Amino acid sequence: MTDDAFPSDRLNHILVAVETIEESLGTLARKQQLTRDAYKSDSDTQDIVERRFVKMTEAAIDIGEELVKQERGPPPQSNPEAMRALGDLGILTPSTAEQMAQGARFRNVLAHTYGQIIDHDVVYNALPDLERYRVFVVEIRDYLDSIGALDG
């Protein structure tokens, strides 16, 4: 880490992003009880799930970009790279970094597809796989705690 104290505006941005992830996890966890047929037949639910995945992953990417800029200066060149850089910096475990890089790629697919182009089976299949985001939040909080950013 740089020798400078962790800037409060950067920390606030990260903490708001963590809250967004946690809220999205709650919403998506409630949608896990839907059957595949119920999910695929309800376009409102599809929109909610897709949007929450996008918001949650964008929040994680924002966290990654903020921490990478704090730690090494230049921002990452891509969304998946932001997640891998957190692994390179020891902020995330290598496994979590790679899983979040996959999540960033999934976000790119969701953000740039619409209507009948979206494979709703792929999105439904992602619903049970929320653990990567939970672990991400834990590792980010652990890192912030380890550098004293959460003190005071």
Give the residues covered by each predicted segment.
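Solvent-exposed interaction patches of small proteins and small membrane subunits
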Residues: M1-G152
